[in-house]
């Protein structure tokens, strides 16, 4: 029998997951066990949480972690009781065995995962099962729709456009800061929801946050988008497909990102934003998530198959991802480069060509221009200053300063410049080394940290020329970033003469 009406207090600890902290006497009376899960119920809605027992907690008090409070809402009291086997457990075991699940089974399973009735080990096994027992197209559609149904859906009453990159390439987060205003300047609605960085030095939301606020409620997002026609906001504050946030957290811990789950997560978020016209960017190359073109084409076919099922008009671009995009890596540095490019109407070819190519595909999807003409229109909008003017509107509607200049953006105070050890030609810039070093320097948590590149592949350099500059806020972080660059040989320089034969 559950103890009724435990008084709610905020927990002073954050174990990294939803937890309820109880006095040992209450835990014993409830029949709940430390380390296992219990259902915490507020106004008839139950959420699963790990039980922690602490004698310092007063009796008949339930201390709730911050995330649990946010999920339950405003509650003065809660009931706590042991979790029985969730209704979806048979479906869960069925999926682990490799059998297919129905739409109803996925709906029940995802609802129970969101409610907290599965622990991280069980969720990890669900994710790993997709590696050795791939989801069929119909089953993947069921998963996507179930993920959408458990969260908010924002509706706009008109066609919604978006561009989504699977990421994995340093410097990629700033591309959206060009694409969105280019597209929005022609009146197309592109309220882009973006993630924070997971394993990279900057996510699009991290970079945009240097310039404006990115966390808004669904109704705020709706109203702002209709005013500015374009937004760049953080999706994590919107409760869109909340199962995705759970899956991402577990994927980070186990180092697994099944392709089917990647497709499901991306498309569920897009459906929750009522996106009906979507461009997918698959960066491909050494050090990217996708290593070669054949792998990219396989992933593209998965996206396109689901697009047909979900009534999304889609095009997939396989883009070069063999080295960083543009010259900057890290939130503040990337915000600077994006702003400079918009103000000048030109910039690094890898950044401008990618942004205009993706924006051009959106124009073609929307019927603004015929196929093959989108790129030139996007470039014209960028060069004319129309994209910069629209970006100022977006910054202002997101409560930022539209008059901000690149030089106003502060960088971390500690610097180290890596110099060329010899004359030669830059033959490789290692994505992994750049990402690791930028994160070691403090990015993305320290927005001013990161790496500014001074060269790209193909540049001719002389001994002592600057190759890149690292920015960090402490000597410790700076030294670790330098160590990683040296260990991984981040910038490879070859002599002009490769070999001499007699």
Curated annotation (Swiss-Prot):
AMP binds at residues 168, 195-200, 204, 265, 289. The active site is at residue 257. One of its GO terms (biological process) is pyrimidine deoxyribonucleoside metabolic process. Transmembrane segments: none annotated. The keyword Nucleus does not apply. One of its GO terms (molecular function) is pentosyltransferase activity. InterPro entries: AMP_phosphorylase, Glycosyl_Trfase_fam3, Glycosyl_Trfase_fam3_N_dom, Glycosyl_Trfase_fam3_N_dom_sf, Nuc_phospho_transferase, PYNP-like_C_sf, PYNP_C, Pyrmidine_PPase_CS. It comes from the Archaea. It catalyses: AMP + phosphate = alpha-D-ribose 1,5-bisphosphate + adenine; CMP + phosphate = cytosine + alpha-D-ribose 1,5-bisphosphate; UMP + phosphate = alpha-D-ribose 1,5-bisphosphate + uracil. Keywords: Glycosyltransferase, Transferase. Pfam families: Glycos_trans_3N (PF02885), Glycos_transf_3 (PF00591), PYNP_C (PF07831). The keyword Glycosyltransferase applies. PROSITE patterns: THYMID_PHOSPHORYLASE. One of its GO terms (cellular component) is cytosol. Its EC number is 2.4.2.57. It is an enzyme of class 2 (transferase). PANTHER family: THYMIDINE PHOSPHORYLASE. Catalyzes the conversion of AMP and phosphate to adenine and ribose 1,5-bisphosphate (R15P). Exhibits phosphorylase activity toward CMP and UMP in addition to AMP. Functions in an archaeal AMP degradation pathway, together with R15P isomerase and RubisCO. Belongs to the thymidine/pyrimidine-nucleoside phosphorylase family. Type 2 subfamily. HAMAP family: AMP_phosphorylase (MF_02132). This is AMP phosphorylase. The lineage of its organism: Archaea, Thermoproteota, Thermoprotei, Desulfurococcales, Pyrodictiaceae.
